[in-house]
Amino acid sequence: MNKHERLDEIAKLVNKKGTIRTNEIVEGLNVSDMTVRRDLIELENKGILTKIHGGARSNSTFQYKEISHKEKHTRQIAEKRYIARKAASLIEDGDTLFFGPGTTVELLAEEVNHHTLTIITNCLPVYKILLEKQTAHFRVYLIGGEMRHITEAFVGEMANAMLEKLRFSKMFFSSNAVNKGAVMTSTLDEAYTQQLALSNSIEKYLLIDHTKVGKEDFTSFCQLNELTAVVMDYEDEEKVETIKTYIEVVD
């Protein structure tokens, strides 16, 4: 096994297991401890994994560092637009909707082209998009509170107090990661605000692209089997089938 093949095999092992110990790689590939340590450094420099005490952790498994709102706008744009169009087809005139934060939901806001809607959001970019469409019959409300600047979403006591009083026919939201049936985000504040909106919604639709499946983040705020359906792209059929073991995926 040459170096290129060895690096590829280590990357596959760590991505499959999430975390792996150095001695597992040594025994599995029949190479020296020093060779494995050098390989882990090289793979860490390439952004594939993160070295931890006694081994390594996959960067594709744990969303340990939340990326900026600006950077999210550059990732999986075609997939997100596909998801947004699918989600828009689920909206009917007369609906009262809650839109959560996220770039996919922002694209959904661009797709919405209905005559009579009431939309409530705690996300400033979503609100700005929808505000341009506001009419006497297309009403848009922004929930205020403490802003999380990385997502430009309002959370905290003020936002939650407003949400507790509201009811929605449908909720559309996204997440940073989905794994083993759990839907996850990066902070407890955002998780609690999402939970409140979910508890006050009749239909609940999660919008995720395939790269979110199999990852983990800091905290879960709901389970897939509590939702109405998931709207996602079909770039990775295996991940779609994984989601279908828990909940319907919109065709």
Curated annotation (Swiss-Prot):
Ranges of residues in domain HTH deoR-type: 3-58
PROSITE patterns, per the entry: HTH_DEOR_1, HTH_DEOR_2
Pfam family, one: HTH_DeoR
Xref: InterPro entries: Carb_Metab_HTH_regulators, DeoR-like_C, DeoR_HTH, NagB/RpiA_transferase-like, Tscrpt_reg_HTH_DeoR_CS, WH-like_DNA-bd_sf, WH_DNA-bd_sf
Coiled-coil parts of chain: none
Region forming the signal peptide: none
GO biological process: lactose metabolic process
Alphabetic keyword roster: DNA-binding, Lactose metabolism, Repressor, Transcription, Transcription regulation
GO molecular function, one term: DNA-binding transcription factor activity
Residue ranges for the DNA-binding region feature of this UniProt entry: 20-39
Function: Repressor of the lactose catabolism operon. Galactose-6-phosphate is the inducer.
Name of the protein described by the UniProt record: Lactose phosphotransferase system repressor
Organism for this UniProt entry: Staphylococcus aureus (strain Mu50 / ATCC 700699)
Gene name linked to the record: lacR
